[in-house]
From Swiss-Prot:
InterPro entries: NCU-G1. Interacts (via lumenal domain) with lysosomal protein MFSD1; the interaction starts while both proteins are still in the endoplasmic reticulum and is required for stabilization of MFSD1 in lysosomes but has no direct effect on its targeting to lysosomes or transporter activity. It comes from the Eukaryota. This is Glycosylated lysosomal membrane protein. Glycans are attached at N31, N41, N62, N83, N100, N131, N152, N159, N182, N209, N225, N271, N331, N343. A motif (Lysosomal targeting motif) lies at residues 402-406. It comes from Salmo salar (Atlantic salmon). It is found in: Lysosome membrane.
Length: 406
């Protein structure tokens, strides 16, 4: 009886400890506020079509995160961490709209800035995968179509898709070509005030120090029957830009079925054991339908990050950093050999998390830990009960078979 009680207590403690471990970020919460085009008087200075600047302020106990999503030029997401709870964004709008003026966007006080990085979406590559290899770097230049330069896209008004209650916004853009006559490339931005996960795959774990971008290529007419796509990304930072991609492995695919890896494009001091300063994190999977099932998943892979000599064509980058910042870039390639081509569904989505500090780490859910505890604990319980029974039987006094004669 005591053994059974001990086993039940063990399972309950396991569930309690696992829940506390998994939810250790839930106690940290930021207060979020959103504003569109901060400091702009639209009646005096109307914005050009397709230009917008979304500012999300994430206030902590003694610091502030600032997210700025901008559609001027190539779409970009700027993350700035300050050690002040009163830091503010200041935009010199006449200079900002010129696109060639450095310092037209600032965080004040400037001395409060601890870290910053900008993720820029620069190009969408399309190639004719005649031999079904899904390895564009091994294809001749003739297999590639003219890339879509995202700086030339016409972007929708962010004000129409802004959701202040959910802290989300949808930025959709189109090329002037016929391929985008009924299609679009969209970036769904989400900011988070506390730890949690998205309901839909890939269900990335986020916390109060992170934001998320979901890239969706929908309804675009491919230029060949065997077209596949790659997305070019660039990162601009101060003294510590994102220079390497770490790939971590796991034995658990509970939240993203069949995916046992996570990739992290991280920023850390050179030749230092210091923790990660910032990151872009994703799972190597994309989906071919808006509400995917298991068969709609397709793997994706990244190239090795390389330094780039010039800044990306983003108005936000030049306005904040000027011309003296480190830039690295990589390509994200979707699909593998044997997978359906883009024209099968004319849909592709991929999700990336952008945040401060070390990336969130997946761990087993309480349900999985209970199953493991029961699966491993039941054999132990049987062994313990068997041992107890054997000991009891051995210690029980045995009746004498032969009675001596007096």
């Amino acid at each position: 009886m005591y053994t059974i009680h001990f086993y039940v207590l063990f399972v309950l403690l396991t569930v309690r400890c696992s829940s506390s471990f998994i939810g250790n970020g839930e106690n940290y919460r930021r207060n979020l506020s959103l504003e569109l085009n901060p400091g702009l008087n639209s009646s005096l200075m109307p914005l050009p079509p397709g230009v917008g600047l979304l500012h999300v302020r994430a206030l902590g106990k003694n610091n502030t995160l600032h997210y700025l999503l901008c559609s001027q030029g190539a779409p970009a997401l700027l993350l700035v961490h300050t050690n002040s709870t009163s830091s503010k964004v200041k935009v010199d709008w006449p200079a900002f709209l010129v696109q060639n003026t450095t310092g037209s966007l600032k965080l004040t006080p400037e001395s409060s800035v601890l870290y910053s990085n900008t993720l820029v979406f620069t190009r969408l590559w399309e190639y004719d995968d005649v031999n079904d290899t899904a390895v564009p770097e091994h294809l001749p230049p003739s297999s590639f179509f003219q890339p879509y330069e995202l700086q030339n896209f016409t972007w929708d008004d962010l004000n129409k898709t802004l959701d202040p209650m959910a802290y989300t916004a949808l930025l959709c853009g189109r090329d002037a070509s016929e391929s985008f006559s009924n299609g679009s490339l969209c970036l769904k931005f989400s900011a988070f005030d506390v730890e949690g996960r998205d309901q839909g795959w890939p269900s990335l774990l986020h916390n109060a120090n992170s934001s998320q971008l979901r890239v969706v290529l929908d309804g675009v007419v491919p230029r060949s029957n065997r077209s596949r796509f790659s997305l070019e990304l660039q990162v601009v930072g101060g003294t510590q830009s994102m220079s390497r991609v770490d790939v971590l492995r796991s034995i658990d695919d509970e939240y993203t079925p069949s995916i046992f890896k996570v990739s992290q494009w991280v920023s850390s001091p050179v030749n230092s054991t210091s923790p990660v300063l910032g990151y872009a994190q994703w799972k190597p999977v994309a989906y071919r339908r808006p509400s995917p099932v298991f068969e709609d998943a397709t793997p994706c892979r990244h190239s090795t990050p390389v330094p780039i000599a010039q800044l990306p064509p983003s108005g936000l980058v030049l306005a904040y950093y000027g011309g003296e910042s480190q830039t690295t870039g990589l390509n994200m390639t979707f699909s593998i050999t044997g997978d359906p081509f883009y024209n099968t569904t004319n849909y592709l989505s991929w999700t990336v998390l952008v945040g401060l500090g070390s990336p969130p780490v997946d761990s087993f859910s309480p349900l999985v830990l209970v199953i493991m505890a029961v699966g491993l604990g039941t054999p132990m319980l049987i062994i313990l009960l068997g041992g107890v029974c054997v000991c009891v039987r051995k210690n029980r006094p045995q009746p004498q078979v032969y009675e001596p004669i007096n």
